[in-house]
Amino acid sequence: MEIICFGDSITRGYDVRFGLGWVELCDASMEQVQFENHGVDGLSVQGLINNLEYWGSDKKYDDTRYICIMCGTNDILQGRHSQYVYEKLVKACTIAAEKGHVIIGLEPQIDGDMDGLNTVLVEVNEKLRHYGMTKGYSVVDFYSVLHDADDMGQIVFAGEVHPNERGYRLMAYKALEIFTRL
């Protein structure tokens, strides 16, 4: 089995040393699974689509392949509306579904709700959650796990959008709840 993760800097593990991002922590916890991390700092959802298409250009559908898609924060920070981000993510999921099973990751909160942008992120996440349920995709709710920890007073962010080591560890635990059941 392989789990291929596509996303932005949060998928890559920005702001922590290599090995401490959520994908690498999952990889270390599941030795029998092959992980690939295609997280790119600053990536837009259109960039994710481009990367996904390039990656999949020589691949056929594989029932033992799971493709995790998580992106959108950079688009929101650049002023994109929730419907635009959602529609692009649906397109990414459609492309991914041609190569394997789809897992949707819901982006973590924008800490401090910079200029009300967290509200846009919540709208995208809710639409994605509903979409994932209707398509039968697994959904990893990274938003809630970090939001709840933040509400309890835990320091889980290194900045406005990037988790710190504790935040990435919580994200890994949440992902493993899904990944270990595949």
PLM-predicted stretches and their roles:
Residues M1-D41, V45-Q46, E53-D63:
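Serine-esterase "nucleophile elbow" of acetyl-processing enzymes
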Residues V16-G19, V45-Y86, I110-D111:
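Oxyanion-hole/transition-state-stabilizing segment in secreted/luminal serine hydrolases
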Residues M30, A96-G100, K135:
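Helix C-cap/helix->beta junction micro-motif
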Residues L52, L89-C93, N125:
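Generic structural signal for well-ordered alpha-helices
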Residues D58-T64, E98-G100, L182:
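Glycine-rich phosphate-binding loop signature in dinucleotide/nucleotide-binding domains
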Residues M70-N74, C93-E123, A149:
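Active-site segments of SGNH/GDSL-like serine hydrolases
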